[in-house]
């Protein structure tokens, strides 16, 4: 049976996600920014939390873990790196591992850059990827602990996923990402279409996520750092994809 995925807001701009397996009743939260909204969503749907899938150690992604584990006795799954940084982890995972949520299978991708321990969870059967703060819609995460080549390599891992997969990211940053992207890639028709959609969704107080990866591959300038046209726009003709990506990220940092 297909996963039932719910999207809601935690903190000010974090996305909360619940993934429910109708066949077994198992329910996972991807990260746990804070407990309250997750508990309310669980109660509204009559679900019990069985698992938390942690993507990285930043507090705005793990702040609710301890309270949820105490309340539900759920299993906490997290990246193998930085063992001391994430408390309450029961199962540590690495690239290529497969995690079961009931009968649902999540494949682990190591996607470092934003942090060194960052992982993404890919539900192949449900055509969904939870990329947290590595890949945003029309953007990507800041590179706090890794390097630009490392982050670019992580984006390439995500870019290889099929076009019909849906991206679920960590934050509602799409409107600001679109604003920046249009300064670099103003003639991109896919980007302009996404910009119009984002304006409509936000005006209706609706989330801009999920989004198809195929659309992101066309519209997200950070996924196109190896496109010679982007290098030309940045006056970096002949530069490597890693160099172009680094320049894009530096410009976004200052925007």
From Swiss-Prot:
Names of the cofactor(s): Zn(2+)
Textual note on the cofactor: Binds 2 Zn(2+) ions per subunit.
GO biological process: methylglyoxal catabolic process to D-lactate via S-lactoyl-glutathione
Keyword tags: Hydrolase, Metal-binding, Zinc
This protein's record includes keyword Metal-binding: yes
Gene3D superfamilies: Ribonuclease Z/Hydroxyacylglutathione hydrolase-like
Enzyme nomenclature, EC number: 3.1.2.6
Keyword Zinc: yes
GO molecular function: hydroxyacylglutathione hydrolase activity; metal ion binding
Catalytic activity line of the entry: an S-(2-hydroxyacyl)glutathione + H2O = a 2-hydroxy carboxylate + glutathione + H(+)
InterPro entries: Clx_II_MBL, Glyoxalase_II_hydrolase, HAGH_C, Hydroxyacylglutathione_Hdrlase, Metallo-B-lactamas, RibonucZ/Hydroxyglut_hydro
Enzyme class: hydrolase
Residues engaged in binding Zn(2+) 1: 56, 58, 114, 133
Pathway recorded for this protein: Secondary metabolite metabolism; methylglyoxal degradation; (R)-lactate from methylglyoxal: step 2/2
SMART domains: Lactamase_B
Superkingdom as given in the UniProt entry: Bacteria
Binding site for Zn(2+) 2: 60-61, 133, 171
Annotated S-S bridges: none
Complex formation: Monomer.
Function of the molecule: Thiolesterase that catalyzes the hydrolysis of S-D-lactoyl-glutathione to form glutathione and D-lactic acid.
Family: Belongs to the metallo-beta-lactamase superfamily. Glyoxalase II family.
Annotated protein name in UniProt: Hydroxyacylglutathione hydrolase
Organism for this UniProt entry: Bradyrhizobium sp. (strain ORS 278)
